[in-house]
Amino acid sequence: MKSGRFIGVMSGTSLDGVDVVLATIDEHRVAQLASLSWPIPVSLKQAVLDICQGQQLTLSQFGQLDTQLGQLFADAVNALLKEQNLQARDIVAIGCHGQTVWHEPTGVAPHTLQIGDNNQIVARTGITVVGDFRRRDIALGGQGAPLVPAFHHALLAHPTERRMVLNIGGIANLSLLIPGQPVGGYDTGPGNMLMDAWIWRQAGKPYDKDAEWARAGKVILPLLQNMLSDPYFSQPAPKSTGREYFNYGWLERHLRHFPGVDPRDVQATLAELTAVTISEQVLLSGGCERLMVCGGGSRNPLLMARLAALLPGTEVTTTDAVGISGDDMEALAFAWLAWRTLAGLPGNLPSVTGASQETVLGAIFPANP
């Protein structure tokens, strides 16, 4: 069974940077050693945002974007290796999620698309890459997401305490770790995505640092109720979503009914939308004793305060409290999934994704010997 140092690479729907994590992984433990966040150039970020919202690209433009993202991921890995004084031979493999540009797990021909050419990563780092983690699950009738609950269960499940792990990235997803029950998990809806999109358009900022804008505004209750009526929120699990659904166009359609509103009030309303949709799903799933939060949203003081207020019987903490950086959780999960793939072990949970069976995930792009 392959064990040793692995690197996880994650570029999420928030597009707030490329997260790269170095960890030692074997069948008994996952030990994080180092991490870094690598910036995404503004032009590349905008190109990804455009394609996620349905803007047409030529095949040439699409191919260029795929290559450029692969090169960006490789640069991020090489920066971490240099920082840690490591060589390619010191790493077993890289687990790279890729950049999701479209996720449509239902319909006539279910599919999901992550780009960032893994061949570029192998060529530029000299390290074997495991990528394309989601499509095997979809081929077996699953949603292809979320995949991280399997990792949450392996690291954070407790024999007697009802726990849930909440990842607030661009999309928020919940892992249900309830003793005596199959692991559950699904996307609750927008996490940081709409908040980030709004402040990017209104103030040119990548995100609302310390929720300054949101805390300066007031929740617009009619707008909140209008958004909460979206059918996704009442759809039963398994379910998953992404930027192709909850995007700036979605927000604009709701704002048409509310002309002239204060931008800070919209920011406050979007924060409340995220908090309310998450807390409702926690309660609908039977509640928990401890909610452990990770992802960029775990650094949002308003979101954390609202979750604690909406879930008075639950201890709301970050995963940092149990020794796992909330900023690095997803990248660490894909390093672990790469280890599972190389070990020939399944990486999905049918109870979470709805797939017909457990399966080994991903495609392996081997480095030259």
Curated annotation (Swiss-Prot):
EC number(s) stated in the UniProt entry for this protein: 2.7.1.170
GO MF terms, alphabetically ordered: ATP binding; kinase activity; phosphotransferase activity, alcohol group as acceptor
Pathway entry: Amino-sugar metabolism; 1,6-anhydro-N-acetylmuramate degradation; Cell wall biogenesis; peptidoglycan recycling
Alphabetized UniProt keyword annotations: ATP-binding, Carbohydrate metabolism, Kinase, Nucleotide-binding, Transferase
Activity-regulation annotation: Strongly inhibited by ADP.
HAMAP family according to UniProt: AnhMurNAc_kinase
Protein name in the entry: Anhydro-N-acetylmuramic acid kinase
Organism listed in the record: Escherichia coli (strain K12)
Organism ancestry: Bacteria, Pseudomonadati, Pseudomonadota, Gammaproteobacteria, Enterobacterales
